[in-house]
Structures are given as C-alpha cells and as structure tokens.
Amino acid sequence: MNGRDLVRSWWSVGVAGAARGPRAVRAAWLRRGADATGPGPRARVPGAVREVEPGPGGGVIRFARSELRVLVAVNGAVFWGWDGAGPEPSYALAGACPEPDPRAELEPDTDGGWRVVAERVTVAVSRHGALEVLTPGGVTLRRDLPPRWWEAEDGGPARWMQRSEVPADARFFGPDGPVKGPRPRDGAHRLGNGVTGTGTGTGSAAPVTMPVQLVVADAGTHLLFVDNPWDGTLTLREGAEGAGSGHDRVGTSELRMEGGPVRGWVMAGTPARVLLTWASLAGAPALPPAWAFGHHHVREGAGGEDEVRRVVAAHLERGLPLDAVHLGDGHLDGGRAFTVDQDRFPKLPVLADELRREGVRLVSVVPAAVRAEDRRGEGVFPDLPDARVQYAGQAARGFAGVWHTVDGSVPSGRVDALCLGRAAHEGLRDEVPADERPLVLSPSGWPGSQRYGGVWSGEGDVGWPGLRASLARVVGLGLCGVPFSGPDVVGGGRDGGFELYVRRLQLAAYLPLLRTGAVGPADGGPWEYGAVVLGHARVALGERRRLLPYFVTLAHLARRTGAPMVRPVWWPAPEERELRDCEDAFLLGDALLVAPVLEPGAVRREVRLPRGRWYDTATGRAYEGPAKVLVDAPLERIPVFARAGAVLPVRAEDGGTELEVWAPAPGRSGGGLVVPESGDDGDGPEAERYSVTRSGPRVVVRRETEDGAQEPSRPVRVRGLDGTGGQM
C-alpha cells in the first residue's frame, strides 16, 4: 500500500463514515496486490512498414516487428500469411499451392500503404498492417486489422488475435459452433470439435466446426479460411445500418487462437464462383456411390446375423425402402476396431453378398481410437499407413463403406479426422467392386475432408430446437465445401414423440445423407408408432427413392463445381436481403425449395418464395415470387415447391429414369442438367442438358447436344399445366 492509498483509506474512514471505511481499506489493499504483480504482458503488433519485396502475384511487406506475405493465385484466391507463414504445408490444400497470377503485382498505394490489383479482387495493405479486400470497383468486402501476438515466457507457441470488419449489411454463414440457423449468432463460438457421449451411439457426434466464413453483403460475397487447426474462439457481431442519417455499425469478427500460424485465404465473387474457387483450392468433394443417397439404418446392439436379416426384412415387408445397414460396435470383437465377433457373425461375407442381391449394403463402424491390448480401456490412434491395410480388410469382409465415431475419453483433433478419412478412402477404393465407390463418413473434419467422404452429424440436439440445428449444420457444411452430410433420425418419446419423429424424417428425406436409428425399446422402425406414422414414413422414404436420380445429379455437379447440394434460399440472388434472413427453408439444387415444419402442432406454415414462378408439388398450384405464401403442412407431408421450367431426373415406376418437367410460365423458358450414374469416380459421365419452352398450353422439351437440339431419349412427364400432370 503506497502513501496515496493510505491517505485515501483514512479519508474514507473519517469522512465517508465507518460503513464505507473498511471496504475502502480492503479495496486499497487489493489494489496494492495488483500493483505488485505489474501489468500483463504487452501484445506485439507489426508496427510501421520498413521495406517491401515484390514478387509474383504479390510480395512480402516487412514491418518493424513482423512481415506479411500476400499472394494472388491464378484461380483468384488470395493468400496472406504473417511472421513468415506460407501456404504450405497444409492439410487443407488438395495439392501444391496454386501458381501466382503473373498479372498481379505489388504497387504503392495512398498514405504509405501498398496494394495488389487482380482481375477479381484488390488487396490493400495499410502502412501499419491492416489488410483490406475490395471488389474491382473499390467497394470494401472486409478489413482485417493488424494481428496481435502474446509471446509465451517459456518459448512456447504465441497466442494471437485478429479483429475484422465487414459491411453493416453483411451476414456470416458457416459451421462456427452451436447454431440455431444457417447463420452463426452473435457471440463467441469455439473453434474445435467438441466430444459428447460415448462414441458408440447415433447421438455421439459433435458438431463440426471449421475456421471458414462465407460472408454475404450487398457489395458481394466472399469466403475466408484461416488455415490454423489450433483451438480458438471466434466472436461475431453482425452490423446494423443507421436509420435515416444515422451512422452504420459495421459487422465485426474477432478471432483468438491458442497458437499456430497466422495465415489464411480469401476468395470473392458470386456464391457459385466462390465455391468453385474453394473447391479448386481444397479439393473436389468425393462422389458417394449411388446407393448412399438412399435410406441408411443404424443397427446397434449385440444381435448377430439373424438380427440384421430381421431388420432388413422388417423394412422391406412394410414397403419401406432400405439401401444400407450400418453396424455399430456390437459386431466388433471386444469393441476393437477392424475386428468381427465370429460367434455372432461367423459368415459375414456371405451375409453381405446376400443383402447386396436385395439392394442393401453393409457399412461398418470404425472407432477413431483403437483399444490398446496391454492396458484395457485406453486408446491409441492407429498408424495411418497400416490403417489403409486394415480398411482394405473391411472390404474383403463384404463392407461397402465405414463410418467413424469419436470416443468421449480420447482427445480428437479435426486434422485427425481428415487423415482417418483419407486412410479409409484409399484403403477401400481399390477393394470394393469395380462398378462402385466406397462410402466414408466421419463425425468431424477439417477443410479438405470432403475429398474423402461425408459427415454424419448424429442425432444432435434433442427436441424441436434440434430439428432447426440439424438443418443449419447441413446448410453450413455445404457452404464450406462439404456437400454430403446429414443428421440421424431416431425415435423415442423423450423429446416430442411421434410427431417430432415424422417431421425429422420428412426433413432428412430431402437432405444428402438419410440415416435412421432404432425406434422404441424393441429396436424397431417407424411401425412402432402405429399404422398412421408408418404410412407417413412410407411416403417420405418413397419420395426419397423417387428423387434418387436427382440426388445423384446434384452430387456429380457438386464434385465438378463445388456447389452445395443443399443451399440457402438466397443462393441464386444474394443481393436480396430478405432472403438472407430466411432460415426455415432451403433449396435442393436449383429446382426444389423445401420448407420443413420446425414447430410442434403446425399444420400450415408461411414460406418465403424467391423471385419467379413456383409450383406446390403436392397440389400443382402456381405462386409468383418474390412473396410470402401460407400453405398447408399436414402431418403426412411438408411443403415442397418446384421452380417453373425445372427438369428433374426421377425414378420411374419401372426402376428407370424419367424426366419430370415443371411447365415454365407462358412465354418463358427453362432447362436442367441430368448426370447419369456410371459407377466411376464422377469425372466420366457426360451431363445431359435439356431445354424447355412453352407456347400457350404446349411445352416442348429438347436435349441440347453439339449436333443441335434432339428429342429426349428418356420418358418425359410435364407437370404444372392446370394443376395436372401429363405424358409428352
């Protein structure tokens, strides 16, 4: 306690009275302790520009206490790295760093700063290290303030923080943590895959988080990827535009990392252009086998081969399509990965062949950590080169794919999930039948995981809020380059009973991955809820089976263009602000708009339609957008709308593929793409392009080829003419 504090404390006792006096003395003593420890460590900041070293596509800007490397690649992506951080090595990149754009050069800017002008973007760096990304017209997309480092006293990794600003009207999208909609809410979001549950059930997967932001504003769309797998926290705050002559409040994000490099990538353009650039950088998504877009059922428990046969027969006898059975850890020998309990599964390859003839595949669980033999209960991560051999052995047992789980007692990083996915994909691809591709599912991941498989997000949050969160995760993952994902649909009365189960199943029927779990104590299916629920489930799964050719087409397009299969409704028109705030509906491709029921007891719901004509697929009624419409949503179905002029490949009654064409508005035209399943890696089959024109009541469908327009080789069914369907 110094003299000043002593005088202050005695003044408080003598003048302010006895009641406040002791508190003042105590506060002074605490201040004395704080003064003794001294202030906290000061952050290191870059300082002022000292020198510049131009190079291909950009160059290096050296500041007083750091340096910044800026590189514009030939694909339009912009790399930035502080403190000597380069783009490689990186788990996220599909290959080597793209070549620099020879036309982009580092040149002086105003006020002592520097800039790089490229075809699609301009990067400006201030003399103190603030990095600004602008459109070619000079409109700011984002502004990253200079980073700050806190060096560790023991010489360990330095913590760092960076604040960023975006326009007031901008909205953030991406899987940045627990969410209630496709947009992460204001507040702090942990960057790191949490672990919940035991890792053996369908509810054990934690949400996937990636340091990826897709930011949409009037000025344009851009994607930011911070290439740092360390744990951290992202704090978001959306901006607000001032009313009248009031000032705008910019949106902000603050990223705090526990260590690792300060580096990242930015790419700008339309949403489609941004995702195409991102796919060229992080790799094209793996193409799942066609059967992967069907109905998967997770079989847990200790039942053997006869129990698996019973589950398959129970579904097929009740008219419920089934394409795959996922075996949990109950089929493993002692819970050890890459093993089979020979007592309960003595003839597993025979069972797999038998089910394959019925159109059903087997998928095996693989715990992310294998049990250590010498000390029961502990786990170690597998040696990945050897794991490829182990995964190949799974194919020899008859498994068509694998799904990884996370053990709650074992720390698991996001990069580990990527490496395991790669080992599984490379181990299985040469062992599965020549006309098929392997299926690999993981509960967590890192940018680049999409190169090897998809993501299963588990049961997720319970209750009706979990329904909205499940949709948000699928949309967010798609915007981050992971198109194949979906939640698990499980039963049970604890969180809403049969109504919630039906609404979950109806939503999942329009998501890329559809997995169901056991219903009731008997580990049954939807029939456990009675005949009414069984009928609703039969309709939902039947529609999923009918749309399977459309899902296959969307998967091929995702591999070729990076476009997500499930898209936010603003995808074709990001400049429409009202669509940016629509979080209760989504686009499946560019042809269908799906409006799931997310509230209990609802039999009608309001749907916001984008611009253009849309048809209610249940009634055939046409609506003109943009508009809000109130439509029926009985328990047996959810509202689904088709875009006028759309061409959808669907499964015909004979098992072939036919074209479902929704009539354009009079005097308008439309079209669509169809990519048939070929069994290869997705690069081979040629896309079939169709055009649709309407003149009065007549709708004409043509296939566009290099030799000109031709008659379609597939059956065509036109819908939307006076609310009825007809054959062409």
Regions flagged by a language model, labelled:
Residues M1-R32, T200, Q727-M728:
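Actinobacteria-biased recognition of intrinsically disordered, low-complexity terminal regions
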Residues N2-S12, R62-R65, V72, D83, ...:
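Catalytic and substrate-binding clefts that recognize carbohydrates or anionic sugar/phosphate headgroups
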Residues V15-P56, R69-D111:
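A low-complexity, Ser/Thr/Gly/Pro-enriched, surface-exposed linker/loop concept
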Residues S66, A73-N75, D83-A85, E119-V121, ...:
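An acidic- and aromatic-residue-enriched active-site/binding cleft used to recognize and process polar
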Residues V70, V212, H315, L355, ...:
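A residue-level signal for conserved active-site and pocket-lining positions in enzyme catalytic cores
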Residues Y91-A92, P321-A537, P572-P574:
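Aromatic- and carboxylate-enriched substrate-binding clefts and catalytic-loop regions
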Residues G137, H425-E431, D435-L439, G445-V455, ...:
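Catalytic core of carbohydrate-active enzymes
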Residues L281-V298, A372-V380:
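N-terminal small/glycine-rich loop or linker at the start of catalytic domains
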